[in-house]
From Swiss-Prot:
This is Pyridoxine/pyridoxamine 5'-phosphate oxidase. Its cofactor is FMN. It comes from Bartonella bacilliformis (strain ATCC 35685 / KC583 / Herrer 020/F12,63). HAMAP family: PdxH (MF_01629). Binds 1 FMN per subunit. Catalyzes the oxidation of either pyridoxine 5'-phosphate (PNP) or pyridoxamine 5'-phosphate (PMP) into pyridoxal 5'-phosphate (PLP). It comes from the Bacteria. GO terms for molecular function: FMN binding; pyridoxamine phosphate oxidase activity. FMN binds at R61, I62, V63, L64, L65, K66, Y76, T77, K83, Q105, Q140, S141, W185, R195. It catalyses: pyridoxamine 5'-phosphate + O2 + H2O = pyridoxal 5'-phosphate + H2O2 + NH4(+); pyridoxine 5'-phosphate + O2 = pyridoxal 5'-phosphate + H2O2. The gene is pdxH.
Length: 215
């Protein structure tokens, strides 16, 4: 996983003082993610993804960050799934990273765009063969009569794509969350935690406003 984030992690933030001194939230994010990669037992790139349905009722689930840079945070999914449909309707989402081993969390809120077909194709071809077949076999979020039905679909697509590359399903791709708000939280004694909020008014704005928040 480190290789995917290498370009952002080269500007690693090391000291506690830099928590408040940094002016670039992506640099601080890269530093924290790199530390989490060392300290977290499983999936340091796991993040809670929050969306809302057409009635405004929220939904949240854990997904995996697959790439990030100064334009946003990328994950992949079935566009016909619940989360895919909710995002496509609102084009807004929120993320939370929580690293218990570091006693830190990051909240991200922003607008969403679809990744390019070329970007999605490249990532899909990097996935294990079984995961590629699963993307075809699973009608994500739809009702499943029993496990045998799913296994039959897996067998069917395994036979269909036994030779050569597995093409990316047309309904399977990625989203990029382009942040307007990024908040860093760090545990401190007596519940007097550190909170550092970066905001910008529009996506093209490169200069972030930085503010401290009461814990």
């Amino acid at each position: 996983m480190l290789a995917k984030f290498e370009s952002m992690m080269s500007n690693k933030v090391q000291t506690d003082d830099d928590f408040t001194q940094t002016q670039n939230p992506f640099t601080l994010f890269a530093s924290w993610l790199e530390e989490a990669t060392i300290s977290e037992i499983n999936d340091p790139n796991a993040m809670a993804l929050a969306t809302v349905d057409e009635t405004g009722l929220p939904n949240v689930r854990i997904v995996l960050l697959k790439n990030f840079n100064s334009t946003g945070f990328v994950f992949y999914t079935n566009y016909e799934s619940c989360k895919g449909q909710e995002i496509l309707k609102s084009m807004k989402a929120s993320l939370v990273f929580h690293w218990k081993s570091l006693r830190r969390q990051i909240r991200i809120r922003g607008l969403v765009e679809q990744v390019s077909p070329e970007e999605a194709d490249a990532y899909f071809q990097s996935r294990p063969y079984g995961s590629q077949i699963g993307a075809w076999a699973s009608k994500q979020s739809q009702l499943l009569e029993d496990r045998f039905v799913l296994e039959k679909e897996v067998s069917r697509y395994t036979a269909d794509y036994a030779i050569g590359n597995v093409p990316r399903p047309p309904y399977w791709s990625g989203f990029r969350i382009k942040p307007l708000f990024i908040e860093f939280w760090r545990d401190r004694p007596s519940r007097l935690h550190d909170r550092l909020l970066f905001t910008r008014d529009f996506l093209e704005q490169n200069n972030w406003k930085k503010q401290r928040l009461y814990p």
